[in-house]
Amino acid sequence: MNIEKALMNYYELTLASYEDSTNRYHYRIVQHLIKGLKYIKVKKLEKVDITIGYKLIDYLKNHTHNGNNSIKKIINYLRKVMQHYRITTSIIDLPHLPNDTKPFERFYHDDLELIMTYTKNLNSSKNSITYKSFIRLLLDSGLRVSEALNIKISDMDFKNKVIRVLSSKTRKQRYAPFSSFSLKYIKELIEVNPKRDYLFYNFIKDRQTNKNDIKLFYKRLKKHLNLERIHTHRFRKTFASILIENGLNIDDLQKIFDHSRIETTIKYVQHNEKRALQEYKKYNDWGLN
């Protein structure tokens, strides 16, 4: 089977399963694979084995700007294509590259207070209202960035304090919670222009807020507050960790996140060592003499 044709066919087949931003990312992966496999002179998908896998990794390291984490995603995409066409070779035995980036850490109280105070004191411009409500809702709901940006005003259920969400990963519908912590700011944002479709809106550019807008705002936060690696995933980890610290059952958190495996949910929960040692003292009664 011709590699370029197989890759493009699989990409087109899966378009409906993902949102636009993910499809654009997958397209870049496909282009890397087409160029890399052409460079190492492999034309047939059936010829892609563990040796070709090593050569492809070498190409990606030396001819692109991809790090280990990105290369792993490219290789995994190739494996999915081969699996789709029921082609099994020794590439399944190709070892995983080590991670070359640190995982995102949760925010702790001092940093959260800095962020919330800064956003609360933003000016009264329409875009400032967008950003302050966005930050509040991230912490209050644990949403992924794509899920939050795609919320429509009609998705908000203020009576039950839930949001109808289309999962950016599974494409399934679920409901995410929110509370009075973000309610006031969301209502303020809607009142600015209640006739638009999407909740988060770039009023300067007259369009839906996008990921690049959020990245630019995070850079602004980082500069003004001197904080490292501000990212939506850190708010998601903070959401999970604080809820568990406050007594939420891990099974309930799994349902909120709509994870199929509880092991995935556990990865989001992060405590500091001091707190863990203090909590140990509350429960270390073994009932023995």
From Swiss-Prot:
Domain Core-binding (CB): 1-86
Record keyword Amino-acid biosynthesis present: no
Name assigned to this protein: Probable integrase/recombinase
EC number(s) per entry: 2.7.7.-, 3.1.-.-
Organism: Acholeplasma phage L2
Entry keyword set: DNA integration, DNA recombination, DNA-binding, Hydrolase, Transferase, Viral genome integration, Virus entry into host cell
InterPro entries: CB (IPR044068), DNA_brk_join_enz (IPR011010), Integrase-like_cat_sf (IPR013762), Integrase_catalytic (IPR002104), Tyrosine_recombinase_XerCD (IPR050090)
Active site: 144, 169, 233, 236, 259, 268 (o-(3'-phospho-dna)-tyrosine intermediate)
Biological role: May function as an integrase.
UniProt record, GO biological process: DNA integration; DNA recombination; establishment of integrated proviral latency; symbiont entry into host cell; viral genome integration into host DNA
GO MF annotation, one: hydrolase activity
Every Tyr recombinase domain range: 102-281
Keyword Secreted: no
Entry's family note: Belongs to the 'phage' integrase family.
Any Pfam family: Phage_integrase
